[in-house]
């Protein structure tokens, strides 16, 4: 099956990393792939545009089936190959509801408060133009969001939706890993710290770890000394 799959992806992209974790969890580690370089705008190349008119990655093929959008790829893989590898969305109604809730909580809130509001502010705003009161508001919102997940992990004592690794973790963990890379001090969040160590050690995460993270320091560290 994996030999019929193909993924276009970029290193360090959370949208790319999520389906890569799913592919490993489902036992499809041998899938074909192409690592693109964002700085050269390779996502706008003809080979991707003919599959994804938006010129974005991840772009995924399973035989003749093309699936674009990170979350759609994750859900496609789980729904199509439910019986393969790790079951990431439970069949039990109560457990499924919990996982689905946490999936979409992470996708909406972690993306907005840690990435779009805080990280992108530092990327898109020159240092001399940054306003400390604006930074303080964004930092406070990020802290509040992280506090919610710290409490959640205090309740579950394991993963974000319960005792088992699930799609909720696939959608949540990369935001934490990226934030740690950019200076987040997990010493202030003991439950999240234990969670981070546990998930980081998973084979699926190690196999899909962004390669340039192993070789290059982050360009900016907006979380360092702030959270």
Question: Where are the language model's segments positioned?
Answer:
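Short, solvent-exposed turn/loop segments enriched in Gly/Ser/Thr/Pro and often Arg
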Residues: 10, 167, 212-215
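Active-site-flanking alpha-helical
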Residues: 78, 175-176, 209
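Short, hydrophobic secondary-structure boundary micro-motifs
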Residues: 85-91, 113-116, 158-163, 206-211
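GST-like domain detector, emphasizing the conserved glutathione-binding G-site
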Residues: 1-136, 140, 226-227
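Glycine-rich, flexible loop/turn motifs
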Residues: 34, 44-47, 56, 84-85, ...
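Acidic/histidine-enriched, glycine/proline-rich intrinsically disordered or flexible terminal extensions
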Residues: 212-227
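Positions that flank functional sites
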Residues: 38-39, 194, 214
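GST-like fold's C-terminal all-alpha helical module
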Residues: 102, 106-201
């Amino acid at each position: 099956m994996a030999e019929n799959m193909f993924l276009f992806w970029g290193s360090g992209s959370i949208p790319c990393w999520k389906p890569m974790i799913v592919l490993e969890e489902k036992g499809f580690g041998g899938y074909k792939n192409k690592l693109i370089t964002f700085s050269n705008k390779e996502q706008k190349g003809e080979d991707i545009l003919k599959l994804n008119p938006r010129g974005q990655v991840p772009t995924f093929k399973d035989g003749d089936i093309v699936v674009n959008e990170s979350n759609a790829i994750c859900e496609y893989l789980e729904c199509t190959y439910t019986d393969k590898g790790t079951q990431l969305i439970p069949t039990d109604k109560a457990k499924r509801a919990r996982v689905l809730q946490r999936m979409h909580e992470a996708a909406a809130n972690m993306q907005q408060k840690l990435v779009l509001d805080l990280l992108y502010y530092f990327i898109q705003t020159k240092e001399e133009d940054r306003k400390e009161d604006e930074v303080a508001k964004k930092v406070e919102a990020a802290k509040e969001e992280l506090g919610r997940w710290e409490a959640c992990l205090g309740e579950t004592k394991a993963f974000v939706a319960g005792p088992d690794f699930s799609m909720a973790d696939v959608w949540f963990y990369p935001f934490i890993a990226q934030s740690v890379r950019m200076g987040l001090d997990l010493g202030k969040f003991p439950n999240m710290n234990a969670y981070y160590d546990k998930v980081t050690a998973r084979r699926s995460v190690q196999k899909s770890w962004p390669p340039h993270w192993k070789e290059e320091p982050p360009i900016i560290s907006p979380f360092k000394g702030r959270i």
